[in-house]
Design a protein with these regions (language model features):
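Alpha/beta-hydrolase fold catalytic core
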Residues: 1-31, 52-55, 92-93, 119, ...
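Conserved acidic catalytic loop of the alpha/beta-hydrolase fold
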Residues: 78-95
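Conserved HGGG/HGGXW glycine-rich cap/lid loop of the alpha/beta-hydrolase fold
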Residues: 22-66
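Conserved alpha/beta-hydrolase "nucleophile elbow" surrounding the catalytic nucleophile
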Residues: 35, 95, 99-101
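Hydrophobic, aromatic-rich cap/lid helix
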Residues: 151-187, 193-198
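Catalytic histidine-centered segment of alpha/beta-hydrolase-like enzymes
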Residues: 225-234
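Flexible "cap/lid" loop of the alpha/beta hydrolase fold
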Residues: 105-112, 119-148
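Conserved loop-alpha-helix segment in the C-terminal half of the alpha/beta-hydrolase fold
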Residues: 193-225
């Protein structure tokens, strides 16, 4: 594959609601990335480019980006249903699901319902301690993390206001605790934990409870990296995802633990703009928003 290969925007118009997604490569998908609250699939563009030896997909969750709006249903279960539909339609073989924050919950819910579709599960700094998201935690994170602010939708049309209403009303509540979701998936799981001192949302208690619930858990802590791991340290995330794929290929994953040492923040100015969640302030579509019908 060309070193300059880039993910391409696609639109699955036959689905209800319509699902926008990015794709890279033309083979059988190996990895599917799921973004968090307020973001779009483009947040994973640097990661997808760094793993371009693998065919990858990354959907916009319902109500986000260019995916369709859903009247009154922005629950984790509904989003997981969309993800399952995408896997069934576009992934003929089991994939690795990589979900960040809210996307981690969506990925866990999908894996618990249809484990046969999923080869491995990567949960990136999702707060696992509560089924019901705490808006105060997210407000604090957004206030303290400038990089995160640049990763959420900038234009109103890119995020259905009802998504935030559902979040604050508790409609994002997961169907059961995280450890119960993990118990239903017997494949390998990786927890990638950001630094709590830098705004990371996955706690040490989250990790401990998950380790007790799942016998094949791989845990890595990112020292000095905040919640938006894929933005603040895309290189480190690429390395960890590639390593997890190697673990899967070698058939070994049993309570492995590691730490990604703190490194200088990446020069993300132009990268974040490219990977960001919203369209330009004028509302005009950028090149990345030009849709190709599959």
């Amino acid at each position: 594959m060309s070193p300059k290969a880039r993910p391409l925007p696609q639109l699955w118009s036959a689905h209800d609601p319509v699902l926008a997604y990015g794709s890279l490569g033309r083979g059988v998908p190996r990895i599917v990335h799921v973004h968090g609250l307020g973001a779009r699939w483009q947040i994973f563009k640097p990661v997808m480019a760094g793993l371009q030896e693998h065919t990858q997909l990354a959907p916009d969750l319902r109500g986000h980006g260019l995916s369709g709006r859903a009247a009154g249903d922005y629950s984790v279960e509904a989003m997981a249903g969309d993800l399952i539909d995408l896997l069934e339609a576009h992934c003929p073989e089991p994939v690795v699901l990589s979900g960040h924050s809210l996307g981690g919950w969506v990925a866990m819910a999908a894996a618990s319902r249809r484990p046969e579709l999923i080869d491995g599960l990567v949960v990136i700094d999702s707060p696992l301690h509560s089924r019901r998201p705490d808006p105060s935690i997210t407000r604090s994170y957004l206030a303290d993390a400038p990089l995160a602010l640049r990763a959420v939708s900038r234009s109103p049309e890119q995020l259905d206001p009802a998504v935030l209403e559902a979040y604050h009303d508790g409609e994002f509540a997961a169907p059961c605790p995280a450890e119960d979701l993990l118990v239903r998936f017997d494949g390998p799981v990786a927890l990638l934990q950001a630094d709590e001192a830098r705004g990371g949302l996955m706690s040490a208690e989250d990790v401990q409870r998950a380790r007790q619930a799942h016998p094949r858990l791989h845990h890595v802590a990112f020292d000095g990296v905040g919640h938006a791991v894929q933005v603040e340290d895309s290189t480190g995330l690429i390395e960890q995802l590639r390593g997890f794929l190697e673990i899967l290929d070698e058939g070994r994953c049993s309570h492995a633990v590691g730490t990604v040492p703190a490194r200088e923040p990446e020069a993300v100015g132009s990268r974040v703009q490219d990977a960001g969640s919203g369209a330009a302030a004028s509302g005009a579509a950028r090149d990345e928003d030009r849709i190709e019908q599959p």
